[in-house]
Amino acid sequence: VWKDECDVNVLVLCEPPSILGDFTDQVRKYYQFWDLILTWRDELLDLPNAQKFIFGCCWIEWDTFNPDKQRVCSFNTSDKGYAPGHELRQQIYAGLEGADDLNGFSVVKHRSPPRTPNKNYLFETAKYHIVVENEQRDNWITEKLIDCFASKTIPIYWGASNIGEYFNTDGMIIFNNIEELKDILDNLDEKFYDDRVEIIEENYERSKQYWDFHARVRKTIEGYIDND
């Protein structure tokens, strides 16, 4: 849409480079085309019309969500394999394929296709959920993590190195490679979860601001218009 056809032109950058390509150079070159740029990419925040905007989202379907936390660890993946996180997920799924038990924790796992109606079953009983973002990049935070905090599930997390700027990492278990994950899963226990009830609640409250992506986009644009 050409600039003179809209009252306000807004660019919202959502995906990491491995998914849609890296448009950083193009955005820098043509930044004046937009009135407002919403981005999680630090390298674009020096542009005069850019604002930091965390992707977030929450895919829990609250109308049918029935939490009953047990000794369960869950994991979800697709069959994709082109992003760094995709590749790691396939390794994890292969490692879990024959595992029904992780140090006394039952395993709930799924690889699509087929797609499931929703993700509730991954979080209703699980005290832990293995989270792998598509890339390890600062500020790249999606529903994969937010769903954990929203459902009061402790994430076993591979993702943004600066996640501590947004959430209390004392309520997370962070890993950087498959070997670290194996060690974590071999030593899972309930005590880690049960000792962090207050931190789980803190991260739940922090996560709320990121649940509704479209409402946040709308509110940010309205704020820009009001202040323009």
Please place each PLM-identified region on the residue numbering.
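Pol beta-like nucleotidyltransferase catalytic core
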Residues: 1-13, 22-104, 112-228
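Catalytic toxin/effector domains delivered as secreted proteins or via bacterial secretion systems
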Residues: 17-18
